[in-house]
Design a protein with these regions (language model features):
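Asp-box/BNR beta-propeller blade signature and adjacent active/binding-site loops
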Residues: 1-178
Length: 178
């Protein structure tokens, strides 16, 4: 959940449900800052049980950010920049427990990018960036969603446009080598 004050300060918070979404309970703030705007956060649970929050930002040069909970979502560490631009982010666990992180790149050349992180998502600053597409028409792209097709193939779908044209949903099939 994202919230905003009259002064424009934003924060994101964790809400939990123990009855499949019928009722929700407030857990804790994930990230807040006096100048950085947070929104469109995705969560990922690591094999060790950490909850990793991948945060979209504004007023921070579109930097991807991360925060981590090591206590089951009762609290999160101070957010930090991941060292690259891209948003919103989406994580998918691979069969070998590595993590495919997908995101839109909303700067020239506009496109869709991925990184493969270690199982605990601790190597985000050094994981190589892989460009899936760099032919977007403008910055109105992204919202990736990766899905395992089988153990070696992933379909990454996303919102896209070419030459500032009609917006559409497109996809790229990746082959993962282990």
């Amino acid at each position: 959940m994202a919230s905003s004050t009259a002064e424009g300060i934003t924060s994101v918070h964790l809400m939990t449900s123990d009855n499949k979404g019928l009722n929700w309970n407030y857990s804790c703030p994930i990230a807040q800052d006096d100048s950085v705007i947070f929104n469109e956060t995705s969560l990922y649970e690591t094999p060790k049980g950490d909850i990793v929050a991948f945060l979209r930002t504004a007023a921070f040069d579109d930097q991807a950010c991360i925060a981590r909970s090591t206590d089951g979502g009762k609290s999160f560490s101070k957010w930090e920049s991941m060292g690259f631009q891209g948003h919103p982010l989406n994580a998918l666990r691979l069969p070998d427990n590595r993590v495919l992180l997908t995101y839109g790149y909303r700067h020239q050349p506009f496109g869709i990018r991925v990184r493969i992180l270690n199982p605990e998502c601790t190597d985000f600053a050094s994981a190589p960036e892989i460009i899936l597409r760099d032919d977007g028409g403008n910055s109105d792209i992204g919202y990736t969603w990766p899905v395992m097709m089988d153990d070696n193939h992933i379909l990454v779908t996303y919102y896209f446009n070419k030459d500032n044209g009609i917006r559409h949903i497109a996809g790229t099939i990746l082959e993962i080598k282990y």
